């Protein structure tokens, strides 16, 4: 099944100016349109112009102070120390969407703007000695983090679309910035076939653990094409001409547990007074990312086959270290592995009121969890998301083009599988309707083909994780008011993955919430998130929080 993901807000400096113009225009007109429903601005002679806006306010509160066990690593403590119990987010979001169409052809554009007051003021950091940035005082956020988490605008979708007949064969296309999600991933965005097609909003994944994969993927510039020679057979293709990295939490932000990644990351603490300073990243080429898929409907089952090549969106860390002493002992930089291949198959079908789906995929040249050639104090040889430290000693501090071909992280073949179900439950004694979604995901390390000496010790070849969301609904509780009570559970069942360092058995999270919809355009929610697991497996084990949000669509 091919899904077009709903694009979440993300920072993108290259498109900030366009997003700012769009946000400014929307804010200027929002007051006049606020009492109107979703706007169909124009319709005449086949032309249809729509403009839809969603304005949301969110406040989130930390419940408990940091744990000394969690902040023991000086390179993973700033995000924890920066926030005392109390307000951790005071944020306004605006999403604006335009669609101009004429028959089967059209142009779609969307943009986002956000502002969070928390990142524009002093924080609660109480440890200057373990504060990684050097451009700001220990109780301030770096400028890059302030922008990413505190105030930004982004152009999301901007593409032309259309459909036509090539003879008797229907053909549809999209050209421009949009998102594709192939395969059948429900929750585990990074484990599925579609993981190679787009970067992931890791901030949203951490702050909303129950979010579905389609809500986490970010758009990129590409051309995509679907050809359907018969009602039961279709082929899909895409070619990307933009590479974007995952949107990792800014250094020192609430959901950051790596002080050296990504926006705002400035240095690694080796020992008191000794540092590795960040130098420019090694970015992969914009080209070389493409894929093809086939779907065949046999009876009630949709089968899919996939092949794609992509560049990694999450980084590995390379370092240059000198033991000569002094205050500038070396450097580190982020590198993004290139030319990873994936081959997969999927199925989806219906069983009564439920959808059952699954997929399996093989990746080659896949970067693995790195052990590193040296361990920093308190790190145990690990790092944020498993982006451990692989030491490399180049002839100069700044990475030269010739060094990009040097493998300083382990790679290998991996096998990934996922099975999911989405069910609509009939009215019962305790609800008027309910939805139940669940997925299990596994990954298996088949072989190590590059730098096996760098593979992290203590990791397992096989790992499995589970996530489920149950949401009962109650209609017309008051006139025009509907309520639901979502409950989510995520838990890593087996193994410490050698493929995904965030998959550690015994770690997980629980979400308890209540959400309301009034007159279909007002929505509100209250959610409590509790993180499960010890600090060595769950870096957010002391960061339980409550969030409140209200939004209006107009």
Q: Where are the language model's segments positioned?
A:
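Short loop/turn motifs that connect adjacent beta-strands in outer-membrane beta-barrel proteins
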Residues: 37-51, 64-66, 98-107, 120, ...
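Residues that define the transmembrane beta-barrel architecture of outer-membrane proteins
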Residues: 47, 75-77, 88-94, 151-156, ...
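Transmembrane beta-strands of outer-membrane beta-barrel proteins
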Residues: 49-57, 107-111, 171-173, 235-237, ...
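Residues on the lipid-exposed face of transmembrane beta-strands in outer-membrane beta-barrel proteins
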Residues: 53, 94-100, 109, 157-162, ...
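Transmembrane beta-strands of outer-membrane beta-barrel pores
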Residues: 57-63, 113-117, 177-181, 239-245, ...
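Solvent-exposed loop segments that connect transmembrane elements
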Residues: 65-81, 120-144, 193-208, 249-278, ...
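Outer membrane beta-barrel
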Residues: 101-259, 465, 488, 494, ...
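Outer-membrane beta-barrel "beta-signal"
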Residues: 521, 541-554
């Amino acid at each position: 099944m091919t899904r077009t993901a709903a694009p979440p807000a993300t920072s993108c400096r290259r498109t900030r100016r366009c997003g700012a113009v769009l946000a400014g225009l929307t804010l200027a007109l929002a007051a006049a349109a606020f009492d109107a429903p979703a706007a169909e601005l124009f319709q005449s002679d086949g032309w249809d112009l729509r403009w839809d806006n969603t304005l949301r306010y969110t406040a989130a509160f930390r419940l408990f102070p940091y744990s000394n066990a969690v902040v023991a690593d000086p390179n993973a403590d700033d995000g924890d120390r920066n926030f005392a119990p109390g307000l951790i987010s005071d944020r306004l979001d605006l999403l604006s969407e335009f669609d101009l169409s004429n028959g089967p052809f059209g142009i779609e554009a969307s943009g986002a703007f956000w502002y969070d007051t928390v990142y524009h003021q002093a924080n609660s950091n109480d440890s200057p000695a373990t504060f990684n940035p050097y451009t700001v005082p220990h109780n301030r956020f770096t400028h890059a983090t302030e922008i990413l988490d505190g105030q930004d605008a982004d152009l999301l979708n901007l593409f032309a679309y259309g459909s036509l007949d090539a003879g008797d064969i229907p053909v549809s296309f999209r050209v421009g910035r949009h998102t594709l999600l192939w395969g059948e991933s429900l929750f585990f965005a990074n484990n599925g076939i579609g993981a190679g097609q787009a970067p992931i909003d890791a901030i949203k994944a951490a702050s909303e653990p129950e979010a579905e994969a389609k809500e986490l993927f970010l758009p990129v510039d590409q051309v995509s094409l679907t050809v359907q020679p018969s009602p039961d057979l279709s082929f899909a293709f895409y070619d990307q001409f933009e590479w974007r990295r995952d949107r990792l939490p800014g250094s020192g932000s609430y959901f950051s547990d790596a002080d050296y990644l990504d926006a705002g990351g400035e240095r690694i603490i080796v020992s008191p007074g000794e540092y590795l300073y960040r130098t420019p990243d090694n970015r992969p080429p914009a080209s070389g990312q493409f894929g093809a898929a086939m779907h065949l409907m046999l009876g009630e089952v949709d089968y899919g086959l996939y092949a794609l090549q992509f560049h990694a969106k999450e980084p590995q860390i390379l370092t240059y270290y000198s033991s000569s002493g002094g205050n500038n002992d070396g450097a580190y930089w982020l590198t993004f592995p290139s030319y990873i291949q994936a081959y997969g198959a999927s199925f989806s079908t219906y069983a009564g009121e439920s959808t059952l789906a699954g997929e399996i995929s093989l990746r080659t040249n896949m970067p693995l969890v790195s052990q590193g050639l040296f361990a920093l104090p308190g790190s145990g040889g690990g790092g944020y998301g498993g982006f451990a430290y692989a030491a490399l000693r180049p002839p100069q501090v700044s990475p030269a083009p010739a060094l990009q071909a040097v493998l300083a992280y382990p790679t290998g073949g991996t096998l990934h599988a996922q099975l999911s179900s989405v069910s609509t439950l009939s009215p019962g004694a305790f609800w008027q309707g309910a939805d139940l979604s669940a997925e299990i995901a596994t990954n298996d390390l088949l072989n190590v083909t590059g730098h096996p000496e760098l593979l992290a010790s203590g990791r397992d070849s096989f790992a499995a994780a589970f996530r489920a969301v149950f949401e009962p609904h109650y209609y017309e509780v008051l006139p025009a008011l509907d309520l639901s009570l979502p409950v989510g559970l995520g838990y890593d069942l087996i193994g410490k993955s050698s493929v995904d360092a965030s998959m550690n058995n015994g770690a997980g999270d629980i979400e308890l919430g209540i959400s309301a919809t009034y007159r279909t355009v007002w929505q509100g929610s209250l959610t409590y998130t509790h993180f499960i697991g010890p600090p060595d497996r769950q870096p957010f084990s002391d960061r339980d929080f409550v969030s409140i949000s209200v939004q209006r669509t107009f």
